């Protein structure tokens, strides 16, 4: 039980109450009345025999007259509004304790274990080691002989790395360098110091090059460095066009090669690169690798391989000929190609158009094929272009941006020859076409074409009618320019551009005037969606059949829309955003041509009038626009499976009324400089600290 002692001093008594424990050393403050605000002395006293405290120390003005204790009851406390308990936390306490432990280790005080490593002794405190390392905890707590030994020998472990790790345990700091990272990963793995293993992987991830990529793969497998393997695969995928040609590439394991070839972001020039890589890898050691050929062949996305290559290279290859399963895969693909189906290709952006057919030399694999092999490679999936439009300053743009799906970023490409807002943009015959619009002074009939292979725009024949708010689409390398408006008229006229002849002609007018109309192609039909007739925004739609040169009404949308974005994905037509008669819209709809029916989709995160829309990679992208207050540079993409919009990489310019279209181009064609292998090397002697 606690005892409270009274200390009475000299002729000037000062009573101090001190809580002590029986037989426990304590401190009593001796203070005289005259100097109680100036001086204080602390003298050790001991409770003796349970009833008397004594000391021989002098205090202040005289000797201690007497010291006695009087046990008494503890005073009563009553709970108040602040509660009956106060929790106190000192967040600095643990760090102060570790600082003291570090000092104790430096001075070799209270050290109770010696680690003998390669003839060197490292002194430490076993409780600290056990708390930091599961390896040491097991050694010191599981009845092992080391529990009672002062000196413990660690065999076959580098002394330097053990010393670095023990220092880290006491200091929370470690310097990882090119010279010690291999030993640190090994030692940290033995000592089960996962945090150091992860840090070493992070350091090595910054050192990956096309030259050490394969050896790091092997190293990562040995130590099960899953984080590093992921970083290596990302690097190898982005640099695949380079590393597949290196002599070291053939050393890659089957498991890693298969994982790499399955990636949609694999950077290839053509899908043929994948087949050639498979053959190269198997042929480097056919006796041990030929049995892997079928599994690797299944990573090949046959719908991306040209017919000529399929027949001449793939079908004639000895590994393919000797595999019944490979032959069956090819036969199924050919049979599927001969059985047209409107919605076989979940990734199609321009189904059944000449541009799409040109980009997809083979139709898709059968529905029974794995999803990963029935999709595009991002590097050969084409690009979305965003051209012209206008921003806050009011003047139209001539600038053009292209979306790199693999890198999830927009890049600048050469400007158009003219500034154009509310311009029509479409891809056809390997080129990108910009048609009509307004240049800030006048409505335009002019048109121009961009050739990705030489990164240049050129003039083409002008339309018969100058107009903005025009929509364009292509069928069989023929471009149709639909509707639009000028300062006095909303048009229902439609012009047809013959790419071969570089000549415009007129076709049948639409039933309704449509300025700010959206158009898209499904099969052999051209669809005109919404727009404005000069009086109000429209919900009506119609379909054009070039074979008979006639328009036909189809089901109306659920919302009036002008300046909306329209595209096709998986055989469905999407109408996104736009303006009604009052404000920009965030609503979206999808049209099923088989059922002649519109359904409502998930709303975008923001209203977007004058939005540009295109499909890529199985998703619909809504680009820029105006939300009623501001011009936007934000981009959203719609996942039809999840019925959900998600943000995507932003365009560089805030713009509305831009022309947006998907085109079958390779991103490396659009770069100002040729794509090079990325060495990723860090400076010599580089280090990584945690």
Curated annotation (Swiss-Prot):
SMART domains: BACK (SM00875), BTB (SM00225), Kelch (SM00612). GO terms for biological process: proteasome-mediated ubiquitin-dependent protein catabolic process; protein ubiquitination; ubiquitin-dependent protein catabolic process. GO terms for cellular component: Cul3-RING ubiquitin ligase complex; cytoplasm; neuron projection; neuronal cell body; postsynaptic density. The keyword RNA-binding does not apply. Pathway: Protein modification; protein ubiquitination. Residues 111-178 form the BTB domain. Kelch repeats lie at residues 383-430, 431-477, 478-524, 525-571, 572-618, 620-665. InterPro entries: BACK (IPR011705), BTB-kelch_protein (IPR017096), BTB/POZ_dom (IPR000210), Kelch-typ_b-propeller (IPR015915), Kelch_1 (IPR006652), SKP1/BTB/POZ_sf (IPR011333). It is found in: Synapse. Keywords: Kelch repeat, Repeat, Synapse, Ubl conjugation pathway. Residues 213-314 form the BACK domain. GO terms for molecular function: ubiquitin-like ligase-substrate adaptor activity. Expressed in neurons. Component of the BCR(kel-8) E3 ubiquitin ligase complex, at least composed of cul-3, kel-8 and rbx-1. Interacts with rpy-1. Substrate-specific adapter of a BCR (BTB-CUL3-RBX1) E3 ubiquitin ligase complex that regulates degradation of glutamate receptors in neurons. The BCR(kel-8) ubiquitin ligase complex mediates ubiquitination and subsequent degradation of rpy-1. Indirectly regulates the protein turnover of glr-1, possibly via ubiquitination and degradation of rpy-1. This is Kelch-like protein 8. It comes from Caenorhabditis elegans.
């Amino acid at each position: 039980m606690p005892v409270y002692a009274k200390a009475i001093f000299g002729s000037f008594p000062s009573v101090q109450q001190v809580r002590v424990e029986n037989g426990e050393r304590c401190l009593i403050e001796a203070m005289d009345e005259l100097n109680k605000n100036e001086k204080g002395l602390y003298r050790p006293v001991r409770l003796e025999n349970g009833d008397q405290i004594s000391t021989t120390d002098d205090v202040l003005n005289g000797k201690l007259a007497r010291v006695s204790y009087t046990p008494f009851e503890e005073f009563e406390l009553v709970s108040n509004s602040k509660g009956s308990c106060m929790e106190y936390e000192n967040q600095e306490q643990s760090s102060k304790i570790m600082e003291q432990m570090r000092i104790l280790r430096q001075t070799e005080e209270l050290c109770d274990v010696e680690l003998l490593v390669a003839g060197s002794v490292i002194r430490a405190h076993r409780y600290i080691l056990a708390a930091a390392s599961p390896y040491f905890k097991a050694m010191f707590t599981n009845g092992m002989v080391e529990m009672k030994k002062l000196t413990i020998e660690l065999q076959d472990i580098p002394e330097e790395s053990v010393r670095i790790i023990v220092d880290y345990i006491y200091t929370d700091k470690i310097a990882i360098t090119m010279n010690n990272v291999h030993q640190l990963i090994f030692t940290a793995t033995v000592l089960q110091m996962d945090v150091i293993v992860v840090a070493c992987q992070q350091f090595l991830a910054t050192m990956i090059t096309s030259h050490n990529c394969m050896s790091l793969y092997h190293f990562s497998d040995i130590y099960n460095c899953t984080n590093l393997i992921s970083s290596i695969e990302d690097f190898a995928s982005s640099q695949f066009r380079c590393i597949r040609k290196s002599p070291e590439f053939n050393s890659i394991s089957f498991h890693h090669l298969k994982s790499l070839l399955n990636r949609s972001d694999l950077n290839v020039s053509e899908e043929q690169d994948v087949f050639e890589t498979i053959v190269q890898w198997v042929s480097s050691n056919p006796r041990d690798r030929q049995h892997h050929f079928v599994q690797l062949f299944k990573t090949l996305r046959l719908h991306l391989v040209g017919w000529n290559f399929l027949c001449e290279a793939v079908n004639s290859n000895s590994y393919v000929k000797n595999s019944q399963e490979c032959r069956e895969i090819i036969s199924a693909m050919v049979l599927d190609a001969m059985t047209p189906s409107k919605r076989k290709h979940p990734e199609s952006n321009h189904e059944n158009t000449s541009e799409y057919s040109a980009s997809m030399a083979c139709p898709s694999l059968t529905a029974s094929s794995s999803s990963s092999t029935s999709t595009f490679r991002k590097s050969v999936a084409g690009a979305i272009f965003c051209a012209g439009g206008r921003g806050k300053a009011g003047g139209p743009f001539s600038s053009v941006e292209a979306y790199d799906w693999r890198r999830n970023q927009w890049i600048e490409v050469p400007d158009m020859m003219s500034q154009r807002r509310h311009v029509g943009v479409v891809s056809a015959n390997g080129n990108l076409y910009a048609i009509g619009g307004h240049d800030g002074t006048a409505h335009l009939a002019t048109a121009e074409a961009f050739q990705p292979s030489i990164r240049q725009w050129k003039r083409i024949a002008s339309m018969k009618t100058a107009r903005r708010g025009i929509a364009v689409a292509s069928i069989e390398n023929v471009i149709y320019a639909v509707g639009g408006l000028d300062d006095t008229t909303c048009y229902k006229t439609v012009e047809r551009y013959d790419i071969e002849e570089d000549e415009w002609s007129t076709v049948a007018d639409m039933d309704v005037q449509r300025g700010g109309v959206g158009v898209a192609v499904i099969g052999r039909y051209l669809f005109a969606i919404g727009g404005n007739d000069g009086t109000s925004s429209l919900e009506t739609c119609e379909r054009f059949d070039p074979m008979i040169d006639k328009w036909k009404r189809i089901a109306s949308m659920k919302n009036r829309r002008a300046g909306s974005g329209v595209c096709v994905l998986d055989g469905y037509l999407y109408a996104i955003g736009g303006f009604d008669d009052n404000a920009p819209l965030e609503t979206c709809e999808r049209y099923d041509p088989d059922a002649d029916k519109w359904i409502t989709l998930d709303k975008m995160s923001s209203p977007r009038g004058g939005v540009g829309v295109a499909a890529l990679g199985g998703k619909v992208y809504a680009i820029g626009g105006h939300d009623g207050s501001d011009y936007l540079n934000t981009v959203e993409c719609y996942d039809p499976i999840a019925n959900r919009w998600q943000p995507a990489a932003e365009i560089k310019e805030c713009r509305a009324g831009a022309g947006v279209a998907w085109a079958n181009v390779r991103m490396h064609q659009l770069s100002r400089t040729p794509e090079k292998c990325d060495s990723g090397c860090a400076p010599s002697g580089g280090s990584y600290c945690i």
